[in-house]
Amino acid sequence: MAKKARIVIIGAGMAGLTAANKLYTSSNNTFELSVVEGGSRIGGRINTSEFSSEKIEMGATWIHGIGGSPVYRIAKETGSLVSDEPWECMDSTIDKAKTFAEGGFEIEPSIVESISGLFTALMELAQGKEISQSDADLSRLAHIYETATRVCSKGSSTSVGSFLKSGFDAYWDSISNGGEEGVKGYGKWSRKSLEEAIFTMFSNTQRTYTSADELSTLDFAAESEYQMFPGEEITIAKGYLSVIHHLASVLPQGVIQLNRKVTKIEWQSNEVKLHFSDGSVVFADHVIVTVSLGVLKAGIETDAELFSPPLPDFKSDAIRRLGYGVVNKLFVEMSQRKFPSLQLVFDREDSEFRFVKIPWWMRRTATITPIHSNSKVLLSWFAGKEALELEKLTDEEIKDAVMTTISCLTGKEVKNDTAKPLTNGSLNDDDEAMKITKVLKSKWGSDPLFRGSYSYVAVGSSGDDLDAMAEPLPKINKKVGQVNGHDQAKVHELQVMFAGEATHRTHYSTTHGAYYSGLREANRLLKHYKCNF
C-alpha cells in the first residue's frame, strides 16, 4: 500500500477548515490529514458569543454582499440565517440614527446627508466604481475628483487618506465663501468645522472597515482592486460559528487538535518538521500555514523565528510591507431598552472648545448603536491606537468614558422611554435609564494567536505582495530546473503553503477571502496528487 501524504494545516479558522474540508471530501482517502490549532477553540477570528442573553460576534460580523458569496451560500444551506433568538442583526441602522456634535447639538439630517454623499462618492471613485449620485452632482464631483487626484499625483505614493483630504478641500473650494461663519443653532461650530468633523466621522468608520490606524497609510492604487459581492450586507442569525462548525463537521474525530501551538517550522529538507510549544515534534510532507499576517510579521522579526531557514526575501518583504491593523468591538448593556442609534461628531483634538472630559480613545469612534431595534445592548467599533487602548481599560473606566461621551455630545436632546434627559454634560445619579450595567470588549491586538484583526494594502505595498503571500515554498524555477539554486529533483515540492485572508489579492480582510484561499491551497494539493475534484 502506498504511503499516504502527510498534510498538516496550521490554524482552525475559516481558511484552515475550508482547506481541510476540501482535502478530506475530495481526496478519496489519499492524505493523512490533521489540523493543529494553537487555541482552545475553532474559528480563529470568527468567535460567536453571548452577551445579555443575545447572540453577538466578537470578531467577523458581516457577510459582505450576498450575491455570489460562499459564506452566504453555506449559511443559507444550513439554515443559519434565521433564528427565534435575538442576535446582532443591526436592523437599527445608521439610516435612522441621530447625529450629535460635541456640545449637545443634534445635526440636521440634510447637513449629514450632504457630507455623507460627498464621502461616499469619493470612496466610490477611489474604488473605481460608478458613483451613485444624481446627474446634477456629477459635474461638480468630476471637478472635485480631478482636483483631488491632481493634488495627490504630485507625491510619490498616494494614500486613500490624502485623496479624501484633497477631495474635501476641493469641495470647499467649489462652494461659496462663509465657511468660517457660525451656523445658527450650533453654538461655536462654523459651517466648515462642522462639515469637516462630519467628514472625519465617516473617515473613522472607514478605518474600522480597513483596520488601518490612519487612512493615510492605506494605498490608493490598490483600493480599486478590492472587490465586493453585490447585494445587501447581513449578519448570521445563528452566529458566524455555524459556518465554521459546518466546515468542520465532515472531519473525523481527532483530525482537529486544539491547544497545539506551533513554535518552529523547519523546511527545505525531504520533509517539514513542526515543533510545538509542549516540546513535541511532527513531520509532514506538506504544511498549510493559515496564521494571521500579524503572527507572520512577529514570526519573521523575533529572535526565535517561526521559519527555519528564514523565509526567502520575496515572502518576508511582502509580509513586512503589507498592512495589518487592529479593530475591536465594544458592547455595553444599558439598564433599559429603546436607546437610539447615535452618530458622533467630535471637535478637533487641538480645539479650545473640545470637552476635555471625553477620553482621547473615544474621540475616533463614529457610532453607538443598538445591536437590534429592541436591544439594550449597544455596540461601538474602534480601530488602531484606540482599539489597543480599549483592551487595557477596566470595565469601570469604559463605563465612565462611554457615559461621559454620550452626555457631552447629546446634552439634553436624547430621551429614552422614561423621558429622563441627560443634563449639563454629565449624568444624574438617579437616571436609571442611562446606566451601563456591564461591558464586553474584544482583544484581538493583545491575543498572541492573532496580534490584530485583518490586513490591508499599505502605502508602499501593492496587490503583488498579496500574490507573493500566496506563493508556496520552495519556489521552483521550472525553466532552469532549480529551487533556490538546488537541483529540483532533490527538493520536495509544496512543503510550506499559505492561506488566509491576507493571501487573496481582491478579497483580503474578509471571511470569504479566507474561504477562497483555503480552497485554493487544497486544490493545489489535489492537482499535485492528480485527485479528481
Swiss-Prot record:
UniProt cross-references to SUPFAM superfamilies, sorted A to Z: FAD-linked reductases, C-terminal domain (SSF54373), FAD/NAD(P)-binding domain (SSF51905)
Field pH dependence: Optimum pH is 6.5 with thermospermine as substrate. Optimum pH is 7.5 with spermine as substrate.
Induction annotation: Induced by salicylic acid. Down-regulated upon treatment with flagellin 22, a pathogen elicitor. Induced by auxin, cytokinin and thermospermine in roots. Induced by spermine, thermospermine, N-acetylspermine and spermidine in roots.
Enzyme class: oxidoreductase
Locations listed in the record: Cytoplasm
Keywords tagged on the record: Cytoplasm, FAD, Flavoprotein, Oxidoreductase, Stress response
Enzyme Commission number(s) of this protein: 1.5.3.-
Entry cofactors: FAD
Domain of life of the native organism: Eukaryota
Gene3D superfamilies assigned to the protein according to its UniProt record, in alphabetical order: 3.90.660.10, FAD/NAD(P)-binding domain
Tissue spec: Expressed in root vasculature, leaves and stems.
GO cellular component: cytoplasm
A biological process from GO: thermospermine catabolic process
One Pfam family, short name: Amino_oxidase
GO molecular function terms attached to this record: flavin adenine dinucleotide binding; N(1)-acetylpolyamine oxidase (3-acetamidopropanal-forming) activity; spermine oxidase activity; thermospermine oxidase activity
Pathways involved: Amine and polyamine degradation; spermine degradation
Binding-site list for FAD: E37, R45, V262, E501
Temperature section of the record: Optimum temperature is 40-45 degrees Celsius with thermospermine as substrate. Optimum temperature is 35-45 degrees Celsius with spermine as substrate.
Chief place of localization: cytoplasm
Family: Belongs to the flavin monoamine oxidase family.
Main function: Flavoenzyme involved in polyamine back-conversion. Catalyzes the oxidation of the secondary amino group of polyamines, such as spermine and its acetyl derivatives. Substrate preference is spermine > N(1)-acetylspermine > thermospermine > norspermine. Plays an important role in the regulation of polyamine intracellular concentration. Involved in xylem differentiation by controlling thermospermine homeostasis, and participating in the tightly controlled interplay between auxin and cytokinin that is necessary for proper xylem differentiation.
Record protein name field: Probable polyamine oxidase 5
Species for this entry: Arabidopsis thaliana (Mouse-ear cress)
